[in-house]
């Protein structure tokens, strides 16, 4: 839709997917998407001003100088390239989730993700207990319950 963004790797995003898909997937990339300049601003704060070592000051700075907003957006984008019936194909899934008057997009997506997985567990769609790998969940079951609809 004409908006520009930047994407970069962040820690933890892939979680256990690297091990799960080892020798099954040629390339796995999991990135965060931000408005242009975000990464440089964070590097300046964390590295140049050394606020990575002084999180109390960083937190106070954010609380005082960065306005809170519900006017944010989460971009959920998946691209898969592979063989289907011997033909190389690409499939993509894109969903832009916006905040509303009650909740920011990050609040909506975080809460709905957790609640959707809990609902799946309560409905018996997740049988194991303890740690559950995100890649072991059924996408269909996830988005078909009332909490996962945010992602549908």
Q: What are the language-model segments listed below?
A:
Residues 1-152:
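C-terminal catalytic/substrate-binding lobe primarily of soluble NAD(P)-dependent oxidoreductases
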């Amino acid at each position: 839709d004409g908006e520009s963004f930047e994407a970069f790797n962040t820690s933890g995003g892939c979680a256990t997917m690297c091990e799960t898909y080892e020798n099954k997937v040629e390339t796995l990339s999991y990135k965060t998407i931000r408005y242009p300049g975000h990464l440089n601003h964070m590097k300046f704060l964390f590295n140049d001003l050394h606020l990575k070592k002084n999180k109390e000051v960083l937190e106070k700075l954010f609380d005082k100088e960065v306005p809170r907003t519900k006017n944010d957006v989460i971009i959920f984008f998946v691209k898969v390239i592979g063989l289907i019936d011997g033909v190389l194909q690409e499939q993509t899934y894109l969903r832009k989730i916006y905040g509303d008057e009650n909740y920011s997009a990050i609040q909506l997506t975080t809460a709905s993700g957790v609640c959707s997985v809990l609902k799946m567990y309560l409905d018996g769609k997740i049988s194991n207990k303890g740690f559950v790998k995100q890649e072991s969940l059924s996408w269909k079951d996830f988005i078909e319950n009332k909490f996962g609809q945010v992602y549908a």
